[in-house]
Swiss-Prot record:
It is found in: Mitochondrion membrane. Belongs to the complex I subunit 4 family. GO terms for cellular component: mitochondrial membrane. This is NADH-ubiquinone oxidoreductase chain 4. It is a multi-pass membrane protein. The chain crosses the membrane at residues 22-42, 60-80, 93-113, 114-134, 145-165, 195-215, 224-244, 257-277, 284-303, 308-330, 350-370, 391-411, 435-455. The keyword Hydrolase does not apply. It comes from Didelphis virginiana. Keywords: Electron transport, Membrane, Mitochondrion, NAD, Respiratory chain, Translocase, Transmembrane, Transmembrane helix, Transport, Ubiquinone. It is an enzyme of class 7 (translocase). One of its GO terms (molecular function) is NADH dehydrogenase (ubiquinone) activity.
Amino acid sequence: MLKILLPTLMLIPLTWLSKNKWLWINTTTYSLLISITSLPMLYHPMDLGYNFNNSFSLDSLSSPLLVLSCWLLPLMIMASQNHLNKESLMRKKLYLTMMVILQSSLIIAFTSSELMMFYILFETTLIPTLIIITRWGNQNERLNAGIYFLFYTLVGSLPLLVALLTMNKNLGTLHILMNSILINQLNYTLSNSTLWYACMTAFMIKMPLYGLHLWLPKAHVEAPIAGSMVLAAILLKLGGYGIMRISLFTEPMTMHLLYPFIILSMWGMIMTSSICMRQTDLKSLIAYSSVSHMALVIIAALIQSTTSFMGATILMVAHGLTSSMLFCLANTNYERIHSRTMILARGLQLILPLMTTWWLTASLANLALPPTINLLGELMIITASFSWSNFSILLLGLNTVITALYSLYMLTTSQRGKFTHHMTSLYPSFTREHMLMTLHIMPLILLSLNPKYILGMTYCKYSLMKTLDCESKH
């Protein structure tokens, strides 16, 4: 773990010692080397040894999210170059420092083997994200968005702290490996139900669950490009990761208490997808799309079947890359027409045809078209939901149709149509932007060729049992 964490921390002195001419080259190259170094950490399901120690652990759930975090850091730096062009050198370095601190917090959060350390790092990610939104956002409303983000996250996390302290008092430890041995099945009592709700509240707000999602569109719309990318791609996944980790320790409470959350998720999935059809702001549409996709992850994580856990892990990785790519494309539009309103960008296909190709690719990935990994994740979740309840296929099928509608609506409104006369002197697309889109779409397609590396905990356990069974027969 330290071979990823220490080089990431060393990005801070590299940033402050680099001259203006070499700042972007040094940080982008070095962070890309770190992301390539992290790729072997994709957990191989047939590897029987878990990487556990007192402080850090790596398993088949945390490794895909860890690699995703490392992969997106150089992409965030590449996407921010034009945005920070007019800033002073000191502010550029401060911006990069905030991103590195956020990245380091995420690495420790995804690999911490103790739940209290995970909680502390879960909260630590709030600080650099808040600074990025409130200092480098575009409009004055960024302060209001920062307040929403701060209070939703803090108020939701307080019950989780109380629940963890209670578990520590009862068990004497919060270590993930020890808890899986020590915890007996909980009785269905009022106190245990309260404990379960306290654990889940913070993660439901972070996902976010429909009804607790008001902070997300505000934060996305007002954040700069790197803030939007890390929010959509990584920070929302902390919620799904937390649900899947904690729910294993609170059995069988999840089985009794999941119904209101699944019903609300299914209803919210339809509502937020429908809201996307009425949006005029491009970043707001992508933000509501994230709420809709994360509702699927909540459903899969709470059902807790083998297929649903696999689907949730895949969809978290796939959505991280897809939504990040969509925000990058929205940023390329904003840098040229200086507006997030979709109708003002119509006709861009005539000027930037290659960018329109990237828009088409990202929209098709968003609606889970093969050969992207999104399709496998959504199919697994729909299959698991149908096995859990036949009625769910109606809502999930309707959501799939609406997702296709708003994805095509986003594409046609922002790229096709009659050319607007206010766009007179637009500069062309850059190689940097095309490289950025390639590094987003390439993992989505390549992972579909061999998805076992991101199938998560349940596939790993299934492979382990199959291997041991074969060995016992021989």
